[in-house]
Amino acid sequence: MNNYETVFILTPVLSDAQMKEAVDKFTGLLKQEGAVIVNEENWGLRKLAYPIQKKSTGFYQLVEFQANPDVIAKLETNFRRDERVIRFLTFRQDKFAAEYAAKRRSLKAKTEEVKEA
């Protein structure tokens, strides 16, 4: 199993429920195919660097997971078929990227603990 990270952008016209349903669809697909989801982050509504499909904003979602390489083809096929996804990028993390991601997650958890206290 390899470590992967995927970021996808959903169209900004979705309601919160529709956005959550779309994210659940893709994470459910990963779990169904035997992937282990390591981290999931909702980056919220952000401005795009350039217009895509005449839209200047989008809902960003990050998912880090461990899976076999054949799962990626199925995931990206579903991204292409879903009209709610306007862009996506999936890449395999090498050992350095995986270490950096783990460090970033632990640092984020520590800052959230400080905010709660």
Curated annotation (Swiss-Prot):
Disulfide bonds: none annotated. CDD domains: bS6 (cd00473). The keyword RNA-binding applies. One of its GO terms (molecular function) is structural constituent of ribosome. GO terms for cellular component: cytoplasm; ribonucleoprotein complex; ribosome. GO terms for biological process: translation. Keywords: Ribonucleoprotein, Ribosomal protein, RNA-binding, rRNA-binding. The keyword Ribosomal protein applies. Belongs to the bacterial ribosomal protein bS6 family. PANTHER family: MITOCHONDRIAL 28S RIBOSOMAL PROTEIN S6, SMALL RIBOSOMAL SUBUNIT PROTEIN BS6M. Binds together with bS18 to 16S ribosomal RNA. This is Small ribosomal subunit protein bS6. The lineage of its organism: Bacteria, Pseudomonadati, Bacteroidota, Bacteroidia, Bacteroidales.
